[in-house]
Amino acid sequence: MATTPYEHAINSTRAVLTGIGPDQLDAATPCASWKVSDLVNHVVGGQYMFHSALQDQPPSAAAPDFAAGDFVASFDEGAAQAVAAFQAEGVMDRIVRLPFGELPGSQLLYLAATDTFVHGWDLAKATGQPTDLAPELAAQLLDGARKAIHDSMRGPDGAAPFGPEQKAPEGAGNADQLAAFLGRTV
């Protein structure tokens, strides 16, 4: 199974992670309940969680503080493990158990790409990096999000997977439009 959108999301977010300095780890992010270090931990830990779920293994009981170490190297390792797990025979058709429910591997692949990419956008915004990330991938993920995300999945930060849709500014790039659709103020 091709994991190309997910791998593009990994590459885009990795570029953002390399631009984060230690002095930025306490900065606020578009995810109001998280600072940069929290979001780094989520993005890096998410890669390991995708891998564990695809291997039918429970997630780690105690999440490491990736932001306190070489989080780019940890991201690379977790992403490589997740990509390999997504490429296993039959995984796209298998039901995968996650901490928040069950879904087919093919849907988890889309979720992994979107989560990884959008949180890369969040980190770019929080650390003053450009947010017009991977325009073609962002357009593809936005199209999928418009089909998959419904109002019942939206609510206040921390209470629902996505915030209320925001209006993107006139002429906003695809990544900014995706972020706004998923509830970020652009």
What are these regions (language model features)?
Residues M1-A15, G19-A32, M49-V186:
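Structured surface interface patches that mediate subunit assembly and partner/cofactor docking
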